[in-house]
């Protein structure tokens, strides 16, 4: 008898990937500030600027609307311009923030994502999402047809906490109605998998993205690999 009844997936680098390679710096950003220009900056200064601009999202992940996301990411870009000494304007910041929210072409489904979810759904599994993300994700979930297969969603911007905070996993478990040992969580980040494991959820690491630190958890290279891995839990 299969002990697994529910599979939770992260979104970023698990089912979705950013076309530019960065979730917050999309193609339009690199049209304004080419990669060659960014690469010529002192990388310590650049990283400090990026981290400083992003810090408010870590300190307060709660968000209520796409409009709030646009406003907050406008401030993100303005801070980044200032800290990195980039010649960006307020108008640039607004355009980048609006593009982040409204342009569906800033991210793609990772190959085999949709087919894997369909196979799991047809196999009787409950499917959930546990993701650190922002309100713009709703229109992408629909555009990529993930909502045809996903039963439940746990988003950081709704709860006001980020993984590895255990409240993210508690919320997902409560929505699922299943015991932790009946669930798998697929994510790229070890710290998130450790948190899930501490709750009794089976962790599986996806290493689709280059440079991911790996550990001792079961691993998959792409979403469809979960189908074979599930046989180990039967």
Annotate each predicted stretch with a short phrase.
Residues 2-111:
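N-terminal helical cap/lid subdomain that shapes the substrate entry/recognition surface
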Residues 1-7, 17, 91, 114, ...:
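Asp-based, Mg2+/Mn2+-dependent phosphohydrolase catalytic module
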Residues 65, 104-105, 126, 157, ...:
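A generic structural signal for short
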Residues 82, 123-125, 201, 215-216:
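Short glycine/proline-enriched coil/turn segments at helix->beta-strand junctions
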Residues 32, 36, 116-125:
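A short, Lys/Arg-enriched amphipathic alpha-helix followed by its capping loop at the start of a domain
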Residues 19, 125-126:
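Short, compositionally biased strand/turn segments
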């Amino acid at each position: 008898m299969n002990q697994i009844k529910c599979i939770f997936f992260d979104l970023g680098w698990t089912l979705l990937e950013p076309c530019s390679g960065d979730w917050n710096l999309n193609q339009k950003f690199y049209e304004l500030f080419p990669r060659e220009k960014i690469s010529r900056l002192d990388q310590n200064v650049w990283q400090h600027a990026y981290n400083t601009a992003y810090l408010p999202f870590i300190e307060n992940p709660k968000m209520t609307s796409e409009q709030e996301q646009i406003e907050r990411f406008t401030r993100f870009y303005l801070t980044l311009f200032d800290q990195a000494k980039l010649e960006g304007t307020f108008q640039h910041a607004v355009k980048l923030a609006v593009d982040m929210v409204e342009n569906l072409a800033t991210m793609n489904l990772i190959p085999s994502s949709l087919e894997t979810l369909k196979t799991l759904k047809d196999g009787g599994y409950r499917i959930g999402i546990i993701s650190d993300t922002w309100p713009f994700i709703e229109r992408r979930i629909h555009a990529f047809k993930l909502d045809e297969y996903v039963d439940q969603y746990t988003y950081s911007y709704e709860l006001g906490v980020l993984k590895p905070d255990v409240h993210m996993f508690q919320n997902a478990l409560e929505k699922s109605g299943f015991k932790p040992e009946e669930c798998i969580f697929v994510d790229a980040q070890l710290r998130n998998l450790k948190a899930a494991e501490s709750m009794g959820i089976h962790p599986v690491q996806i290493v689709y993205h280059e440079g991911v630190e790996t550990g001792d958890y079961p691993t998959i290279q792409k979403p469809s690999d979960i189908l074979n891995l599930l046989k180990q839990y039967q």
